[in-house]
Structure formats: C-alpha cells, structure tokens
Amino acid sequence: MKDVKIITGAMLDKKAQGVCSMDLRKLDTTICDYFVICHADSGVQVAAIADNVEEQMVLKARRQVRRSQGKENRFWVILDYSDIVVHIFQTEYRRFYRLEDLWADAVTQHYN
C-alpha cells in the first residue's frame, strides 16, 4: 500500500529502528488494516519521527492524522489514520509492550 511506504520512508528518513508493517486485513479485527511500528532511543527522536510521518503524509498522500496520542511524554506515540495506525516507541517501551507478539498472525514486513 502506497501510504504504508510513505510512512516507513518517513520513519527511515529520521533513522528509526526496527521499522515494520503488519498487515491485519486477514485477521478478524476491526481496529485497522495496518500497523506500522518503529522505535528510537530518545524522546526527541520519537517526536522527530512522528512529526516527519505527519508531514510526509500531508505532502505525499494529502492525509491528516485523525487522532494522535503520546506526544507529550514521547514514550509511545500513536498516529491514527483510520486504516493505518502508526506506533512509534522509545526502545524500552517497544520491548515491554511487544505488539508484534500480540499480533503474531499478521503478515509482517521489515524495512531495516
């Protein structure tokens, strides 16, 4: 999907680590079609990644984020685009929450 590529590219531009997308369409869920996940070692970098994802989605896909959470504390930022939910973690929070393990049946693609 084009928008997933825009998001992963925006993450990689800001040196995000562990970038992956999870295709949830074949799972019996109504949450969204895709998760796009990454992590960074600092809150400053988490914020920079989130800002770049939002900017690139506006520029290249003409899409505004519908809802966002976590920008204040920068431990785990969630950007909700309805069909795509973006998760940007600080490294230790990604290890703790392990979203990939919770959604292990999803088809996962790694980008770095």
Describe each PLM feature range.
Residues 79-81:
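Active-site beta-strand termini and strand-to-loop segments that position acidic
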Residues 1-31, 39-77, 91-94, 99-112:
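Polybasic/polar functional segments that serve as interface/processing modules
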